[in-house]
Amino acid sequence: MTTLTAQQIACVYAWLAQLFSRELDDEQLTQIASAQMAEWFSLLKSEPPLVAAVNELENCIATLTVRDDARLELAADFCGLFLMTDKQAALPYASAYKQDEQEIKRLLVEAGMETSGNFNEPADHLAIYLELLSHLHFSLGEGTVPARRIDSLRQKTLTALWQWLPEFVARCRQYDSFGFYAALSQLLLVLVECDHQNR
C-alpha cells in the first residue's frame, strides 16, 4: 500500500475487528452511514486495490439506510453467519477451517499481548487477528520497537490469517443474502492481501 499510513491501516483493522466481533448497535449503525465515514471511505479509495471493495460496502450501507428495522435485520444476519453451525454460516474462527487455533496465541505472546476478559470468544476469533494487526501497525508508526521485529510478526500474523480468510470470505459471500458482511469481509480480504504484499 502506498497512500495509507501505518496508523490509518491500524485504524481500518481496529474498525473491522469491532464490526466482526459483535452485532452493530444503533450508534454504530448511524456512524457507518455518516458524512465522517464517507470521508474515511474516500481516503480508503485513494488506495486503488481497495476501490471496488469500498464501493461495494458503500452500496450496502446506502441500501441499509432504507431497510426497515435495519439494526434487527443486521443482527439476524450476524447471528446467522457467525454464531450458528457451520452448515450455512461463515464461522469467524481459524479452527473452523482446520487451522491451528494455538497459532494466534503464540503470536499474541510474541507481541506481548493477551485477549481481554471482556471478549467472550475463543482466541482464534477473526477479531483477535485484526486487533493484533492493528496493534502491530500502530507500533510500526510509533517507532519504539525495531521495525524489523514488528514487520516479521506482522508477516507471520498475515500468513496465519491468510490460511483461512479466503474460505471465510467465500462463505460470507455465499450465505449473507443482504450482503453487508459479505462486502465487509471482501474489504478485509483485499486489505490483508495488499498488506501481505507490502513486505
Swiss-Prot record:
TM annotation in the entry: none
InterPro entries per UniProt: Chaperone_TorD, DMSO/NO3_reduct_chaperone, HscB_C_sf, TorD-like_sf, TorD/DmsD_chaperones
Gene3D superfamilies per record: 1.20.120.1820, HscB, C-terminal domain (1.20.1280.20)
Protein name per Swiss-Prot or TrEMBL: Chaperone protein TorD
Keywords for this protein: Chaperone, Cytoplasm
GO BP, sorted A to Z: protein complex oligomerization; protein folding
Lineage of source species: Bacteria, Pseudomonadati, Pseudomonadota, Gammaproteobacteria, Enterobacterales
Location(s) in or outside the cell: Cytoplasm
Gene transcribed to yield this protein: torD
Principal location listed in the UniProt entry: cytoplasm
Key word Flavoprotein present: no
Purpose of the protein: Involved in the biogenesis of TorA. Acts on TorA before the insertion of the molybdenum cofactor and, as a result, probably favors a conformation of the apoenzyme that is competent for acquiring the cofactor.
GO cellular component, as recorded: cytoplasm
PANTHER family for this protein: CHAPERONE PROTEIN TORD, CHAPERONE PROTEIN YCDY
Similarity remark: Belongs to the TorD/DmsD family. TorD subfamily.
